[in-house]
Amino acid sequence: MTKKTNLLCIALMMLFLCARADEGMWLPYSINGQNLADMQRLGCKLTAEQIFSFNQPSLKDAIVQFGGGCTGELISPEGLLLTNHHCGLSYVQAHASVEHDYLQDGFWARSKAEELPNEGLSVLFLTYIEDVTASVLNGVTDKMSEKERDAKIAENSKKLRIEKKGKRDVRVEIVPFYHGNQYILFVYDEYKDVRLVACPPWGIGKYGADTDNWTWPRHKGDFCIFRVYTAPDGSPAEYSKDNIPMKSKHYLPISLKGVQPGDYTMILGYPGSTDRYSSSGAVKNIIDLEGPAIVSCRTTKLEQYRKHMDADPAVFIQYASKQASVSNYWKYYIGQVKQLKQNKVYEKRLAQEQDFRDWMIGNVERAAKYKGIFDEFDNYWNHQNQYTKALIYNREAGWRGGEAVTFALRFRQLNAAIEKKATPDQIKKLAQGMKPSVKDFFKDYNKALDRDVTIALLNLYYKDVNPDQLPTMIKKEGDKSHGDFTAFVNNAFAKSILVDENKVNAWLDNPKSLSKDPIFALMYNILESYWVLSEQAETVSKDRADRLYMEGLMEMQKDRNFYPDANFTMRLTYGSVQDCEPRDAVTYSYITTLDGVMAKYKPGDWEFDVPKDLIKLWENHDYGQYADKNGDLVVNFITTNDITGGNSGSPVIDANGNLIGLAFDGNWEAMSGDISFEQQVQRTICMDMRYLLFIIDKMANAQNLMQELTIVK
């Protein structure tokens, strides 16, 4: 009986451990014995060299940094690249029109000749890594001020980048880790000819939209397919009709086996930013000031977007990508503030700081080294809290609020040249160089929408920000109009050249000072206020305290396997497929199915409409080889992996190195995860590869793509 009880306890303990989320965004080149042991315990069958190597093809060679904000992966020998729909949305939107509505209807290139080039899109392949901490910190002393320290680090880093780059056409970056306690050099090959191959209809790729965003259960086919092209010799190149599809050094086979609870999962990608070693003051600032300010401004903007997008299909196409961009982190901050409170992250940070104090004062040398860092934190946040709200409103409701105001920023250099009386040739060169960006701006610009957005945001700005921190123009006009900027904005839009493409182009042909243009003047007044507030806010720094606190935590917890905060460098996270129990008596299954898609279906609804072709396949239960053992078509699944923004589009890889999913989101219960990892409830939301293949094969009948893929059964 005792033996059976012990065995049961062990089994339950193992189940509990497996159900916990697996914390850590690890640098893949430095995976150590503890990480490998954990990975093998979870089921990984790959060696470290098979995962990451500069000596042989490895998983690393299939992973790209996509478009400066996402991740993608190669899935064919000819450079076929998979990422998320929301990562590719702006490029799809740029090709869309009312006549060719690729947003609503999707896009499928039936041959390489039909693939669409994308100006400004590039992908990066990692080719070299080196720890350069000693070189970067050469000549840096403890007696230096932070300003002197930063200048020396910048000088050393610039020299190293130049040396490493040489005459090669590569991108070299030196990135700080652990709050400046370590510096690593990365070298990338940049490929600038990346063409759109396929994207699903809106009712698949954007299914659930804002309502479902950041939540589980989910039912979204969040994918987009591109292709990387190279020069004929295989080197990176700008777009050219003579370019050829990339010959992939490594690509990911796609598994049809599906997922079960406990299955090993690994994700390689480029997580953007976390702050898991921050002080309690940073957490309180987000809860009380930063989060609410961003949500308030973006709520106001989104209300105007929806009003105009719902009224006009052409405006919907113009603003679909913009709306998605604004709403993504609008909902993120709503969830983050809620879960930081719910999960008592501020209280946990206070407790950690008390542990640090107790450890610090237990040793004379430690006390001397770390003394004063908490006073520095307190001083910084007491100062910063006076400026956080004003700076956020200045950005979100000011120079990045209305589009015309943001557009005016582009004319600063040219206007400065005019006012400083540059030569006619210099002015002409600058003016003509702006014409392509003018065309690009007005392609997706709606004056009526922007006018309403600008009015609403300036009304909010004036109402919510302390009068002495308002830009002088907004203060003056708000006082005069009792906070109603309707007449002011209407007048500005009537008189400014910056809301009319023909007038802007005519001005570029004969440019004169824009200083009296009402929108340019508004932009400059807002920007000047931002500079003043920023300068005042930056008079107090916490860089030294952050660096020493990080060093001290690592010294205090010597047995802990620390990983660095995310900073848009390649990382590896490992875990497993698991259910989620977010609260008492609530359990979420690890998968969702096409039945769930249809249960949410709302004909004509912008969030929950479903393409007719998909409905027909569901009605006929025509899933083919993509059904699971129960005959269902799995759409999404969840894992215990540790990801954040930037990981969008990352591959979910099984124990054998096959692609089983596409990571695209995190869950609501763990929205505090960028600040504090939530062991019990943190989940990564993934699209099942069987759903991807089903859409390509059965719905789109894109057999040209199916023939390129390596499918493992």
Predicted stretch roles:
Residues M1-L8:
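Bacterial N-terminal signal peptides that target proteins for export
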Residues T2, C18-K713:
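Terminal presequence/propeptide segments associated with secretion/organelle targeting
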Residues C9-F16:
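Bacterial N-terminal signal peptides
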